[in-house]
Structures are given as C-alpha cells and as structure tokens.
UniProtKB/Swiss-Prot annotation:
GO terms classed as biological process: cell wall organization; peptidoglycan catabolic process
Subcellular location field: Secreted
SMART domains in the record: Ami_3, SH3b
Disordered: region residues: 109-146
PANTHER family: CELL WALL AMIDASE LYTH-RELATED, N-ACETYLMURAMOYL-L-ALANINE AMIDASE
Domain SH3b, first and last residues per copy: 41-105
Protein's name in the database: Probable cell wall amidase LytH
Family the entry assigns: Belongs to the N-acetylmuramoyl-L-alanine amidase 3 family.
Amino acid sequence: MKKFNDWLEKHNLRNIPTLIVVVAFVLFVFMTIAFLNHNDEDSSTIYITEDAELRTGPSAAYPEIHSIDKGQNFHKIGKTGKWIEVVSSNNKEKGWVAGWHTNLNIQADKNPNAKPLKDKTIVLDPGHGGSDQGASSNTHKKSKEKVYTLKTAKELKALLEKEGATVSMTRESDTYVTLDDRNIKGDAYISIHNDSLKSSKANGSTVYWFKDNQKALAETLSASLQKKALLTNKGARQENFQVLRQTNVPAVLLELGYISNPTDEDMITEKLHRHIVEQAIVEGLRAYFSE
C-alpha cells in the first residue's frame, strides 16, 4: 500500500480530479485504438478500402453492376467464401464485393495463377447419342443435337485437362447411353444439350439445376456465359431433370442455344463460337472452385 501511495505522490495523482482525467484519457486512447483496429467480420457495416466492383454474385465471373470507390460504406447482409453481400445505406442497391477490397481483412488468393481445377474430376455428359438423335434443325444443314453435344464435350474435355482436371465422359462416340448409366460421380457434373422449339424465333442459352447444392454452380456458369458468349443468356433455372435428380454432386444441364433457330444453329455448328462457349464454361468452373 505504501508503494502505491508513493507512486500516486510521485505522479501527483492524489488529487482526485487529476486521477479522473488520467483514467478518462487512458479509456479514450484504448477505445480509439479498438475502433481503428475494428475489422470484425460480423460487423454490420463495411468500408471499401480501395476502388472495386459491385457484382451480381460472389465471384469475378458474375457481371459487374458498377464500380465503387474507396471510402464508400455498405451494410453487410451475407458472405460466401471471400465475397461479401452488401446493400447500400438507402437500400437502393444490392450486390457482392470481394472481401479483400474491404476493412474485413480478408486476404486475396496469394497465387492468382493457381489452377483451381487441378485434381478435380469433372463429368461431361454429351446429351443423346446413337438411336436418340435429340433435336434437329429445319434448315439445309439438318444439324443433329447428338452430333454437336459430343463435339462440344470433346473440345471442352481438352480445355479442362489443360487446367489439370480429370474428365470423365458418359459417352465418347455416337452411342446410346441410358439416363441411369449416365450417373457418374465427380466433383461437378455437366450435361450438355441444345434446345429446340417449333418456333424458329426462340433463342439463347439456359443453365438448369435441381438440388440446392447445384444452384451455386448453375448461377456461376450462367454468369460466365452471359459475360463471354454471344448467345442470349436466359439465366439459371430450377428444373426436375432426371440427370440432375439422380446425382448428389453439384450438377447442371446446359442448353447451349436453340438448334431450331438459324442464328443459334450457326453458332452451335461453328467451331470458333463453340470455343468461346467452352472457354466461358471453363472460366465459370474456375470461379466456382476458387470459392
């Protein structure tokens, strides 16, 4: 006790008002430091620490809504991987921003050249085949769906293998495979088709999913197709297809254009355009497995 009294005497703190001022100052310094260092991921308000982009979904594959400037703040409403779902203070705009552009101290991937598809098993299912030709066009080309789903799958397989993925195919030639036999396990399952209607006006691509664990893959691939491909994008939709229903892995069914539409048919049958679509699928898979 004597030592404490001596310490108070030495620092002239026996005066109660002086002691109160010192304590208040210490508390102020402590609270200021705590505020400046605050980066709790559970905080409802986030701050943009460098110029960034607000996107429609949780990856760079999703379309950009608009750019956002350093210093802006948003309310945090969700989080997927390293991406934060935000809404503006006036609730007028909503989207996703990369966490490494915020005060949440989320680190960007250290190696941007890493291959997220390395050692992943991707199942490619070229629709139809053999006696089941699928849809066909009414133009002079008389294009058959089974031919171009297989071409697309083979070309896509080569691109995915360059990314380090292992690719399994439900068919590799013009053979008929039952829907039950198409149920092959992998890290992702992609069934490839072309759409068709009696009307030649219908056009565009659609990505279908059925189970909850398939939705994120569908939305990511749809966003990548919208960003890269020339086909009209109809988005990601839920549908009870058997190939999606019978598997427990993330799976999608891609309708890559209407073979009944002459413009879409040209894009389906031209290798250069197929390559653009295939590259969009690869980029979508990269984005999906990066999260």
